[in-house]
């Protein structure tokens, strides 16, 4: 017969290995920071494409914090705090490759961090 303490220990071990999940609003700063992290990484990986997009759309501007993060190869997440959620959404969804490249990468990064979003 299995002891109750053995079952409890097994359940605790399983719970400890399962990744914690958090459900938060899409406008939450934690979501914004993950989105911006993916965005900055994408700009770094496809800089020429972003330069061409900027040249074709000169009114599409980026906050100075994003530009600094792109060219500062250290930890940039603290630079990106305080950017308004609507500005984050405008930037990441405003490029033609949002659906094909950014959205899947953002979803993967949020999932990896155990973050799930709900509509505001």
Curated annotation (Swiss-Prot):
Pfam family, one: SRP1_TIP1
GO molecular-function terms, A-Z: structural constituent of cell wall
GO CC annotation terms, alphabetical: fungal-type cell wall; fungal-type vacuole; membrane
Subcellular location: Membrane
Membrane topology: Single-pass membrane protein
Keywords: Membrane, Transmembrane, Transmembrane helix
Main location: membrane
Entry keyword Protease: no
Positions of transmembrane segments: 7-24
The keyword Nucleus belongs to this UniProt entry's keyword annotation: no
Biological processes, Gene Ontology terms: fungal-type cell wall organization
Domain of life: Eukaryota
Similarity annotation: Belongs to the SRP1/TIP1 family. Seripauperin subfamily.
Record's protein name: Seripauperin-4
Source organism of this protein record: Saccharomyces cerevisiae (strain ATCC 204508 / S288c)
Organism ancestry: Eukaryota, Fungi, Dikarya, Ascomycota, Saccharomycotina
């Amino acid at each position: 017969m299995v002891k109750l303490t053995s079952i409890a220990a097994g359940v605790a071990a399983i719970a400890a290995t399962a990744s914690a999940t958090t459900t938060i609003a899409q406008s939450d700063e934690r979501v914004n920071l993950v989105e911006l992290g993916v965005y900055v990484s994408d700009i770094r990986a496809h800089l020429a494409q972003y330069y061409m997009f900027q040249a074709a759309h000169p009114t599409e501007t980026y906050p100075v914090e994003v530009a600094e993060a792109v060219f500062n190869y250290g930890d940039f997440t603290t630079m990106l705090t305080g950017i308004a959620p609507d500005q984050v959404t405008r930037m990441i969804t405003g490029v033609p490759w949002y659906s094909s490249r950014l959205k899947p990468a953002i979803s993967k990064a949020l999932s990896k961090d155990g973050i799930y979003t709900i509509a505001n």
